[in-house]
Amino acid sequence: SDIETASLFIFLNRTCFNGLYRVNSKGEFNVPHGKYVNPRICDKDNLLAVSELLQRVEIMCGDFAETEKFASVNSIYYLDPLYKPLSETSSFTSYSKDGFDDSEQVRLRDFCSRIAQNNATFIASNSDPVGDRTGESFFEQIYYQFKIKRVYATRLINANPNNRGLVSEIMISNVGNL
């Protein structure tokens, strides 16, 4: 049932490594268990409040391009794709079974261009190769017609706790003041 599926998802999210969700090439969940002594599995008040808010929301599961038909002046898109790897050791792009390589990044840029033409607002986030000093200007090249702002975000998921902390990311948008 839908309730059982949602319950199992919440359980996995609360008990797996840092609440990470990813699947292997077969589409199977493959995150190791976390090392929690007493994880808080269910926050009843929060679940009920979120459930009430979601009654007015349509959630779609599928390719981002399928939402293009909804793009209008009243639409706001926040796009948080798999981030472009900054190094060979950070090349994990497989939260989904199909991955998200440079060609997918370009397909996302094309999507952003089309929804912007329909007067929809979008904000996309990604890794920052320039801020990471790799010198790569991939995003500046493909998103040259949009605004790019650098921000710092806290990263809590990393196998090496010493590598957790603030990292530079980019916000790409078709609105003036990010």
Summary of predicted features, one role per range:
Residues 104-154:
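Conserved Class I SAM-dependent methyltransferase catalytic core
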